[in-house]
Amino acid sequence: MNLRLLLAAFALLLSCPASAETTDVAALAKQSGTPDIPGLKIVWLSPWGDVAKAHHWQNIIVHQTEGPAGSARGGAAEQHRNPTRRGVMVWVETDGTVYWAVADDLVPTHTDGADRNDNKYIDNGKTYHQVNKDTSVGVEFAGNYPDVTRPATDPQIAAWKVLVKILMARYDIPLDHVYAHNWIDFKDARYCEGCTLATLAREWGK
């Protein structure tokens, strides 16, 4: 009997860190202002407002921009000055720095209308003309210039692992609503934009 109790206590102990981590992420994600998020270096160009007043975000779209290392800062600054211009809410530099450029009650212009309908990567019956700027948080990863096939850097991947959890928790977005831009639009044939990062996010969440 004592052995059973000991094993049960040990199992409970093992489960506590994961449970605590989930609780911490959920609590952090619903805050306002400029919270410190472990594992992320965030430059808050636009602080978080009341999440209850945020736009009704249903999806996350991963973009990669043909800009050199260091271009996320400039792109985010331009986005902050003109929130609805073509671009995204969140930018990620090659060193892993995250720039929160736009308040989450505003809608930047991104995607090409979710016009992919060939089911090449996923079932586009669920995305066609639905996973677009009006429903989706955009996250832009800088640095694939001059070689568009260059993958995201290790610091970007590490930041993404934390960031995607925060975005999902803040806006109550399910894991299967994390998409690569190439999955929902016809994009550059030289590479699959956002595909590795979106796939990683879905694998991490299993």
Language-model regions, residue ranges each:
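Bacterial N-terminal signal peptides
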Residues: 7-15
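Bacterial N-terminal signal peptides that target proteins for export
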Residues: 1-6
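Basic/polar, cationic surfaces and motifs that engage anionic cell-wall
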Residues: 20-38, 54, 130-138, 142-206
